[in-house]
Amino acid sequence: MKNSVRAAIAAVLWAVLAAQADTGDERILAARDAARSGDRARLAAYAAPAGHVLDPYPEYWWLSAQVARPADIDPAALREFLERNRGAWLAEKLRGEWLRGLGRRGEWGTFAIEYPFLEQPEQDLQCYQFQARLANGDGMALAEARPLWFNLVDTPESCVPVLQTLVREALVSPDEIWARVRRLMEAKRNTHARYAASWLPADQVPAPSDLDKAAANPAGYLDRLPPNFSATRPGRELALIALARLARDDTLGAYVRYQRMDERFSPAERGYALGQIAWQAAQRLMPEAHTWYRAAGDTPMSDEQIAWRARAALRAGDWKGVRSAIEAMPASLREQPDWAYWLGRAQAALGKQDAARRLFEQIGGHPAFYSILADEELGRGFEEGVPEGLLA
């Protein structure tokens, strides 16, 4: 016992002496090695600032090691470092680590104090923040969290309780649960899809193995469907999932199989199937893509699906279709220079010259590809060379 204590004291003394000697780059490198090896005694000795430009790093490594062991956390030391390095990447990173630990342990009081100082919270921390608000009885938290149901594909563990609460409080319908299952299966997030499917009403929950079969061998699954598959919601949904997955590898084969069973689906279900098939066809530059998109009607689509719908309409020379597709995009996508330009072209082709000019004016006047094209539509042309006075 005495020997082990002496050995520990000797190790600490050695680390202190080494830290005093290595006040330059060597100290920083030694601190990095101590952090990697988990040598907390050496790391503590190297953490004190010594006038080096990289001093925040050893201190960060030391505090990060504390955050990993809740019993060792010194909130005052953490806050002092965070305040001293406010706005720096290391401070943001350390605060995020601290908040994750607080969230995992359900220490919502401290979490609520520290979270507002985070400048760019990642998705898992946003979900911990929703958990904190729910724990504190914030009645607006679920309403603000509801968009996660529709937008979240890669689902951090901290978001699962929030999604579960949306289901428990009946803030998402069975149709919306199925829509999430579809989207997760489209993105090949099968595990999360199975989890979401488990939240369906009992009479609609599919067997997890059926979801896997529909995704793993979609052609075989569709070819072996029983005649009465469409009698239940799960039967139709699994067929739709298989069609969407098959369309990725054999788009025409998916459409042929869809035609055999299209009357078994509701109008909304037919729109979904055709939207998936058209999306894959457009990416393969198949001439049928535009026709299939039109047949899909106004079925809800992801941003990527809508963008390919506009491209398919462009390839088909359907300016009305181009306009309707771009106008259906969210503003963040529709206002990007490429889509603003093509919307302007569509408006011009459809006789809406004033609307076209306004769009070209919005994006013109910059040394960028679509800006130059917009200037040409406005009759300005493009002048090469360095602007006068730039080199003065």
What feature does the model see in each segment?
Residues 21-392:
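Extracytoplasmic and endomembrane cell-envelope/extracellular-matrix remodeling and assembly machinery
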